[in-house]
């Protein structure tokens, strides 16, 4: 994301700006057991550390219970700091990762370029119009302005894919790539690719799995 941000900053004459990246720790269902909840927090922290995110939105071991206490918030922060500190000097390199990065870049370009087009060069205006048109679409977002038609699901290995891109303007080859990955999961699980996968994935981590499996 930082590479693409630098590209668009130069393209749009915003080179004197600083853009930060953020990782939100798991936003779905959390396990009620605090030890298991800390594992989920550590998992998200590890992703943030390896991705070199600028900041992290931290969860607590009380996510499944209700409003966290001050002490629970502090525990979540300490757990996150420890995990990030342990991985501060580590890098993840693999051909599979490079492929995923290339795909994410193409998907991002498709959305950002369309937003520029909708705004006729004005990205602020383009972003507003893109949200209204569903070009920028956030799954499960509570905002009344969000289009809310795009649906994600994990593939068999746990990567998040587009089950239904809706109005997100992905090139046909990327739509097919995403669907093929989900169809492979469906085949391995002996079921159809459907909205049930989305539901299963939302609750999977609270049940101790990354990918939601059928009963």
Name each model feature, range by range:
Residues 1-81:
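Helix-rich catalytic cores of soluble enzyme domains
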Residues 53-215:
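Acidic, glycine-enriched catalytic cores built around paired aspartates
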């Amino acid at each position: 994301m930082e590479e693409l941000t630098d590209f668009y900053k130069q393209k749009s004459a915003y080179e004197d700006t600083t853009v930060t990246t953020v990782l939100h720790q798991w936003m779905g269902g959390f396990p009620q057991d605090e030890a298991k909840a800390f594992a989920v927090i550590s998992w998200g922290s590890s992703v943030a550390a390896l991705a070199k995110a600028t900041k992290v939105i931290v969860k607590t071991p009380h996510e499944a219970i209700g409003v966290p206490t001050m002490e629970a918030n502090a525990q979540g922060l300490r757990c996150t700091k420890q995990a990030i500190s342990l991985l501060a000097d580590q890098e993840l390199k693999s051909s599979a990762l490079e492929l995923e990065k290339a795909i994410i870049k193409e998907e991002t370009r498709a959305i950002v370029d369309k937003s520029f087009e909708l705004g006729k060069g004005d990205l602020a205006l383009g972003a507003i119009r893109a949200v209204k048109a569903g070009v920028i679409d956030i799954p499960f977002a509570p905002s009344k302005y969000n289009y809310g038609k795009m649906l994600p699901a994990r593939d068999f290995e746990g990567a998040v894919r587009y089950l239904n891109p809706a109005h997100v303007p992905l090139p046909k080859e990327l739509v097919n790539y995403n669907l093929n990955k989900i169809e492979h999961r469906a085949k391995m699980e002996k079921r159809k690719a459907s909205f049930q996968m989305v539901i299963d994935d939302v609750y999977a981590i609270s049940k101790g799995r990354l990918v939601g499996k059928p009963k």
